[in-house]
Amino acid sequence: MALKDRVLPPELKRLETALKTSGLKVDQDADVLAFAAFADPSGKGTRIVGIAQGQFQTNAILAHFAKEKTKPYLLRNNSVYPMGSNGMSVVFLNQTTMVFGDKAAVKAALDARDGLAPNFLSNSEMISDMASVDQKAVWSLLDAKGTQTMLKSVMGDAAQLADYDTVRNRMLSSRYTMDFSNGVKFDMAVVMSDTLTAATAATLMKGVSLMRKSSGSPLEKSALDETTIDSNAGTLTVDYSSSDSQFASLLTSPLFQSVVR
């Protein structure tokens, strides 16, 4: 639980708290509960939305809202209800599916569902990639632009090198998974346009690892020793595993913060 509390982003903790205090009893009725992070359509950072599926007692929930004098606002034909007092909202798409999050996140989700904004289902390549990650506890898919932004942060000063410019323009997509069933296991794959580019990216990444080892703490050096960087058939791969306690200690390190900032 301590590790979970430290790994979850503040927005997701807020969403989890709002759900628990909403009186909706989603944890009892939901068969599937998932959280998704996505880029805000307006370009203002990242939004997180929750999606739950199950046999919900919608009549009882609506009666609860009526008792609490909670009034919805209409977004097209969708009734969006405030959820608690911390700015969260919830909407029932049908008898078995609900979407919840902050007001802007719920609106963005409904706009995508109603065909008013681009949505994930229109990207056939990412839908295909999803099959390799969606069974994990935490997973992410990034398109070419998102991959470029992510790797620029990971590379740090090395992103200024000429070789990186060549690599950056040949990034197609990336994905990562995290598994907490036996310690912490992190696997990332970055798909490049060709085998040579993937090998070049792996070489650059290994160079970054060596530089950070030279200036890192013993904990950071140990983490980098446990990280395997390679390339295979046009894909850059990065794999890391550790115990829960090792990973928890790493979360506050300058190395980890420089990667996730």
Question: For each of these PLM feature ranges, what is it?
Answer:
Residues 1-82, 128-166, 203-228, 235-237, ...:
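Structural boundary/hinge residues at secondary-structure and domain interfaces
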Residues 45-47, 56, 75-77, 91-98, ...:
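Short, solvent-exposed coil/turn segments at beta-strand boundaries
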Residues 48-52, 98, 172-176, 182-190, ...:
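One face of beta-strands
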Residues 60-62, 109-111, 198-201:
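Solvent-exposed, non-transmembrane alpha-helical starts
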Residues 83-115, 183, 228-247:
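A short, solvent-exposed beta-edge/loop patch
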Residues 88-151:
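A conserved glycine-rich beta-strand in the N-terminal activation segment of trypsin-fold
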Residues 116, 170-172, 176-221:
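Gly/Pro-enriched, hydrophobic low-complexity segments
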